[in-house]
Structure formats: structure tokens, C-alpha cells
């Protein structure tokens, strides 16, 4: 086997050196329309890893990235009341849901994931599409469960922010408080 990041020989998903590098992310904050989106890596740093979600080995890559970034966040996060980590459109594709993998590591006192609660009714792919296309083709999110606590939105990447903002607006229209979003990578970096 080879390290998914540097391609050196290893029996694990990442070699020891890359595991150490990836387990020390540099958080970035982007604000869109007054809404904060926290990312752990610049897109340019982990582009190949992000695109692995379209293959079966992406499951192992996402599990490790979630452990390196999201789990570490969950350990340091505290909030006095119950909060849900809500993966955006956590439908199973390619054998797993990459957003569900990320949200699953967000477990701590008063923080737990809620699955299959917000799905897009549109099947259009945004991959490689520009802002105009994204604005003209909304996801049309549907809330599938009763949500009784504030939400942290979870996704793998923020590009233009249209998906995250549309998810936020859908939830807020239903009276659900959305605190912020967590993503692995920000495409602006």
C-alpha cells in the first residue's frame, strides 16, 4: 500500500509523517452573509484527498481526515445545551456518505450527529460548476426529521457557499437555529 498523501510505502491510509502533518490543521474562517464557516485545510493542500470521495478508498481517507480535524474540534468544543452536527445531504453514494463520516466524529458532551435529516431534492451535481450555475440550480433541501436543538452544518468543502447558505436558510425558515458550518477545506485557499 501507499500513503494517500505522499505516495510513500505504508500499511496505513497515511504514513506516519503525513498523519502528523494532517493532524495539525490550520483552521480558516470564512464569513458569508454574516454566517461563519470554519474549515481545517486549504483546498489546495488536500485537493486529491477531497476528490477521493468518488471512489471506495475515499471512505478510509475521509475517516482519517475526520479523525485528524473534526474529532479534535469536538474534543475542544463546549456548549451549555444540546447541539446537533448535521451533515448536508448525507445520502449514500459510492458505498458511503462522506458528510456522514465527518459528522460522525463530532461527538462530545452536548454535541452529537443527526443523520438523514436534510437532503437535497435536486440531483444536479455542482462539481466544477460556477457561481451562476449554482445560483440558477438550487439544491431544494428538504428537512426529513424533527430537529429540536441548534445545528452545526457539516460538509467537505466550501466553494461559493451556495449549498451551505441554502441549507442554513432552509433550516432557519423551519425555525431551527444554525450556529455555524464546519468543512474540511475552503476552495479559496
Question: What feature does the model see in each segment?
Answer:
Residues 69, 97-104:
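Charged helix-capping and loop-helix junction motifs
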Residues 87-99:
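Glycine-rich phosphate-binding loops at beta-strand->alpha-helix junctions
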Residues 3-6, 15-18:
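Short cysteine-rich clusters marking metal-coordination/redox-active sites
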Residues 16-82, 92-93, 117-148, 182-189:
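Active-site-facing substrate-recognition patch
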Residues 10-11, 22:
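Cys/His-rich microdomains that often coordinate metals
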Residues 71, 75, 104-108, 169, ...:
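Short, well-ordered alpha-helices that flank and scaffold nucleotide-derived cofactor binding pockets
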Residues 153-167:
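A phosphate-binding catalytic loop at a beta-strand-loop-alpha-helix junction
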Residues 165-189:
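PRPP-dependent phosphoribosyltransferase catalytic core
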